Amino acid sequence: MLVLGLGCGSSKSSSPDAAPTSDAPGNALCGPAQGSATVTVTRHGVPASGVAVVYQCPDGRWADVVRTDADGRATVDVVADSMLTIGGPWSNDPNQFEYPTLYTIMGVQPGDQLRVEPEAPAHDLLAQRDLTLPGAVSGATNYQVRSGCDHFDQFTSYPASVSVLAFSDCENVDNTARAWIVAGDSTGPLAVTYADFGATSPEPVVLPDWSSFLITPTVGVENAPAEAAAIETATMNAMRGEQRFSDGHPTNSPAPFSGGVSGMAFYTFPQDVASELEFQVRVGYDDAQAPNGSAVFYRREPFTASHTIDMGAAALPRLASAALDTAAPARPQVSWTTDGDLSVADAAVVEISWLGDVQEQWLVLAPASTTAPLVLPELPAIPDAAAPPAGATFDPPSVRFIEADWLDFAAIKQTGLPGLTDVLQLYAPDIAVRAPAGTHLLRASVF
């Protein structure tokens, strides 16, 4: 699955309550304010107070620093098309997801309500339920147990009974839950059994007889670019907006692919188990630097027997290169070249990373109309929102353009940073970026 992986952020420590710099030029530097924008910062669902929020003019000059309050909010008077950069450090728990050291949102408008983490519903444990299986499956060498929030266990021999957890944000509004078990061998799945049950009900749950897996649909690709060095197709079964079972088929070099690949069959759940099918196609232009290339993602409901993806019509233009200019390390510049017009996308996501005292990252969310080179904004001399230092060692940049038929840039700005890591999945856990029911198209071009 192609995702916007962000890796690990800075591990340095600085007080989030440090006083803002006293030499701020002030908001007037950017011109008369046209309204206010609010950013809400949480860490793992908990409001983060004292986080530095740097206000920058449309030309990138920094004007002021404000800090989030006890509710994790900061409100700034802004002009149209300004920028906000949120500083770190981020993670309260070194074992949890670490955010970039710096996160810049470009194209900020008066009235924007921005987030740095998706708004998370309550995650309360409702119950632990015991399930009785219907018997062993002949030839099965593994049994996968799944339930809400993608809770997962695996057994290498037949378990007569298993336990699953039911959480408030993973079940239906009527507190019903679903659990299912997939029996398989080294070649793939063999059978599935599942049951819906009251998440808080004390009655025992006995799973029904096993159902056989289907081996449909087929997914083919036509009009693949001549430069393609790899094509991968995959399917994801989904239920209640979460991925439940996936199957993929990479087709690697030698190229060319004569314009595409023929339809290949995929394992899927029986249609009464998973109500929706998502499938994806990824074209890689460089085996050595995959996933550089164009990715096309679909979600379909209901299941159909076969699909053919016309890459010529569906793919975003190819990103052919990306480069980083660090002649002025405090304001690096990222440039890219493309085979076509990427302004048709919804957003650009640019990431740089460097090694100074520790490994650091800077993620920039920008309108797709942004032209290269993208000059990163100026930052104040404060420890928790500091620019890359002189002498830093930089990694190659990452550039991504994304477009979804149910999103626009205004919506993406409100998704929250972890949502950006999943915006290339139609079943993203962030409800703000998850595709609604029906047939949808998500496209991405990545270097």
Q: Predicted segment positions?
A:
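Solvent-exposed loop/turn segments flanking beta-strands in beta-repeat/beta-sandwich domains
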Residues: 48-49, 140, 228-242, 337-361, ...
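Signal that preferentially marks extracellular ectodomain short beta-strand elements
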Residues: 165-171, 261-273, 371-398
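C-terminal structured domain segments
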Residues: 375-436
